[in-house]
């Protein structure tokens, strides 16, 4: 349970970071 939760959290964090980085670079959103 803990391992799965940690993995999901990391994936979500990476996705959010990527989205923020893309938005910041493009400046479209």
Curated annotation (Swiss-Prot):
InterPro entries: MftA. The post-translational modifications that lead to mycofactocin involve oxidative decarboxylation of the C-terminal tyrosine residue catalyzed by MftC, introduction of a tyramine-valine cross-link, removal of the modified C-terminal dipeptide by MftE. The released dipeptide then undergoes oxidative deamination by MftD, glycosylation by MftF and methylation by an unknown enzyme. The record marks 27-28 as: Cleavage. Precursor peptide that leads to mycofactocin (MFT) after extensive post-translational modifications by enzymes encoded by adjacent genes. Mycofactocin acts as a redox cofactor of nicotinamide-dependent oxidoreductases encoded in the same locus. Mycofactocin is classified as a ribosomally synthesized and post-translationally modified peptide (RiPP). Belongs to the mycofactocin precursor peptide family. This is Mycofactocin precursor peptide. It comes from Mycobacterium tuberculosis (strain CDC 1551 / Oshkosh).
